[in-house]
């Protein structure tokens, strides 16, 4: 750990107060990296509306200043644009050890993966190699710290196609580790694949609503020293408390699909119920991150952040030992678990 001094906004229109914080780091599975408890999810840098490049650069630089060292992107985020943004960060922060994680898109362009699809249709060996080479170029690095499959079906666990490809990439030094980003609300759709010993990390949706990774996936990963990257900590934005029934997004923004009326209305009701009982003067975003932080299986979480104020607020959560998250508060969050099954809008 290291001491970090930075300023946060105590209240609207107040002066900046200086606080000395210690960014907390956790072990990243068998790779033995020390990664910041709060990482950086970069989907919103290229795949969502509302991001401006200069503001993006400032937010990324601020995160590094505050101790963030894990950055998750994907080729599919703007067809390499998000990877290019990360490449520029690596150049600007060349003196820092920053960990790069990206993802290989499915060849058939299906998110999530389709049950019964073949590995040859989704991740043939040459496709894995070709897109790793593209990402290496986009990122401007010789080695990708963590390459990941952007979708997955556990039925592919015994296929040699993907195994031979990642063994080749590791042997050639093109990647250090390999991970899987599991489909939404299918946290166990990877367990048999983990038995192969070839996967170093799992990226999974885990938040106050989506707690089911704790049932089977987390215990397995803890026992076998597999890193967990918790994604979608704010349920695509609902757990920030900023959405309402009239919320809209630009054409092409994923949230138009995810927050269709079928999902938005019950989500807002659950957010209201949660917000009405917030403990210890916590904000909803703070509670959301502290809930994820409480679980020892989680190596890092990757909220999306495009504003400096959000970077500062989120990094602050990664800089304490979470003593304020008591057993009583944990029991409170348990009441808000929401088990859901994949559907047409839950890509």
Give residue spans per PLM region.
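Short, Lys/Arg-enriched N-terminal segments with co-localized hydrophobic residues
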Residues: 6-8, 12-22
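N-terminal binding-site loop/beta-alpha segment at the start of enzyme catalytic domains
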Residues: 19-98
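Conserved, mostly hydrophobic/aromatic
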Residues: 28, 40, 71, 86, ...
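N-terminal small/glycine-rich loop or linker at the start of catalytic domains
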Residues: 30-48, 101-119, 148
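Short, well-ordered coil/turn segments that N-cap beta-strands
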Residues: 34-38, 67-69, 94-98, 141-145, ...
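Short, acidic/polar
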Residues: 51-63, 123-138, 185-192
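Active-site groove signature of glycoside hydrolases
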Residues: 136-155
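Beta/alpha (TIM)-barrel catalytic core signal, keyed to glycine-rich beta->alpha loops juxtaposed to Asp/Glu
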Residues: 152-344
């Amino acid at each position: 750990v290291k001491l970090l001094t930075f300023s946060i906004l105590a209240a609207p229109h107040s002066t900046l107060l200086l606080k000395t914080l210690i960014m907390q780091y956790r072990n990243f599975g068998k790779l033995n990296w020390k990664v910041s408890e709060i990482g950086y999810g970069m989907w919103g840098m290229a795949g969502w509306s509302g991001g401006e490049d200069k503001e993006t650069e400032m937010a990324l630089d601020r995160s590094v200043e505050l101790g963030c060292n894990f950055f998750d992107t994907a080729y599919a985020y703007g067809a390499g644009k998000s990877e290019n943004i990360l490449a520029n960060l690596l150049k600007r922060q060349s003196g820092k050890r920053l960990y790069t994680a990206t993802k290989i898109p499915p060849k058939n362009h299906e998110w999530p993966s389709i049950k019964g699809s073949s590995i040859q249709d989704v991740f043939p060996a040459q496709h894995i190699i070709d897109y790793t080479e593209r990402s290496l170029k986009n990122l401007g690095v010789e080695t990708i710290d963590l390459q990941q499959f952007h979708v997955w079906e556990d039925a592919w666990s015994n296929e040699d196609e993907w195994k031979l490809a990642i063994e080749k990439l590791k042997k050639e030094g093109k990647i250090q580790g390999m991970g899987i980003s599991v489909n939404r609300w299918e946290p166990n759709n990877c367990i048999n694949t983990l038995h192969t010993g070839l996967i170093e990390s799992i990226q999974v949706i885990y938040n106050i609503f989506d707690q089911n990774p704790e049932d089977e996936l987390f215990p397995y990963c803890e026992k076998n020293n597999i890193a967990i990257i918790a994604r979608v900590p704010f349920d695509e934005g609902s757990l920030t408390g900023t959405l309402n029934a009239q919320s809209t997004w630009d054409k092409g923004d994923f949230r138009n699909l995810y927050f269709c009326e079928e999902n938005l209305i019950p989500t807002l009701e659950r957010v209201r119920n949660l917000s009405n009982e917030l403990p210890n003067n916590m904000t909803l975003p703070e509670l959301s991150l502290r809930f994820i932080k409480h679980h020892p299986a989680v190596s890092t979480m990757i909220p999306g952040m495009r504003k400096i104020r959000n970077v500062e607020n989120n990094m602050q959560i990664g800089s304490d030992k979470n003593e304020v998250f008591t057993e009583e508060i944990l029991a409170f969050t348990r009441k808000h678990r929401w088990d859901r099954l994949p559907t047409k809008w839950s890509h």
